[in-house]
Amino acid sequence: MSSRVLTPDVVGIDALVHDHQTVLAKAEGGVVAVFANNAPAFYAVTPARLAELLALEEKLARPGSDVALDDQLYQEPQAAPVAVPMGKFAMYPDWQPDADFIRLAALWGVALREPVTTEELASFIAYWQAEGKVFHHVQWQQKLARSLQIGRASNGGLPKRDVNTVSEPDSQIPPGFRG
């Protein structure tokens, strides 16, 4: 069994029992590692060094700043479970993927960087409502994941351009052309 000794001073348990005051007085840093049967058993610490360690622990336990963050920042509300229809069902307007949809999509081999936008979900629901097909909830989520993968990759991963924006002329001259 390997172990790490955290002090250069090592003494056998018999020597410590025989004259503990002298052993601790000679210890560098007020700490000595005590061995029994050629293995570290415990550390012996002087009262002064113990007081230093306790003061250091108390100092580290106090916050380094007087700014306190509100606890509600750390407490995320539990998502209320959504009633998912059992078995196969046709797409309906209020359908939502599970809260851990991005994780599930990754398990299905679809890496999504961002969550589903409301526009993407609305488009998906509208398309499949018109189709009238029935699938299980997990199958709908898989279809949504594939739809997002294809839709987002169609433009090289870039967001779609707004067709209403007016383009601005480029005044740079490409290399190799005279201006």
UniProtKB/Swiss-Prot annotation:
The consequence of Y74A is: In the residue 1-88 fragment, strongly decreased dissociation of PriB-ssDNA
* Positions of the UniProt region annotated as N-terminus (NT) dissociates a PriB-ssDNA complex, involved in trimerization: 1-88
Name a single GO biological process. Answer: protein homotrimerization
Q: Where is this region: Disordered?
A: 156-179
What GO molecular function annotations does the UniProt record carry, in alphabetical order? Answer: identical protein binding; magnesium ion binding; single-stranded DNA binding
Q: How does it assemble?
A: Homooligomerizes; monomer, dimer, trimer, tetramer and pentamer have been seen. Exists in a monomer:trimer equilibrium. During primosome assembly PriA binds to replication forks, subsequently PriB then DnaT bind in a 'hand-off' mechanism, which allows DnaC to load helicase DnaB onto the fork. Component of the replication restart primosome, which is composed of PriA, PriB, PriC, DnaB and DnaT; DnaG primase associates transiently with this complex. Very high levels of DnaT in vitro bypass PriB in primase activity.
Q: What is this protein called?
A: Replication restart protein DnaT
